Amino acid sequence: MKILFIPTYVKLDILPSLKKVKIKEERVGVITTAQFIDQLDLICSNLKGSVKGGQILGCNVESAKKILSKIDAFLYIGLGMFHPWALTVLNKPVYILNPEAKEFKKISEKEIEKYRKERKGKILRFMHAETVGVIVSTKPLQYNMEKALELRENIKGKKVYIFVSDNINEGQLENFKGIGCWVN
């Protein structure tokens, strides 16, 4: 079956939400998702001291890394916490603007510390697992079988299986009882 991916953008006037943005740092890297990427130029032209970062995809923060030396903080524009957590590993303050809910906040040091502890726990689970499942998405810009195969080669002393799928949910993963840790 052929799958057609059609980019979809949020139809939302983002300018009223930008009025909520209060950032003390002077140079702010603006990062967003595919749903808001068409408004990135508008956002940056209306935010003093902003540096256009681009799109974040999953936990891939390459667009953020490219502007790291030019900024003092990040402003993530989008929904949810998945993408902002990925930005926290770059050791700059991370602010979040959810234009849909018209909410603005900074991720606190306490929240970051809690996230890092959870992350360490996941790394420990990986270290102790005998069997690892590597998840590869078939979605455009996410499919990277070459990286998965390289990862499998580099993981020593463990059985490594590669799982390829379009959509993944925890319920599906529970069907594979022998996997001690999942890597995405």
What are these regions (language model features)?
Residues 83-160, 167-173:
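Redox- and metal-dependent alpha/beta enzyme cores, enriched for Fe-S-associated oxidoreductases
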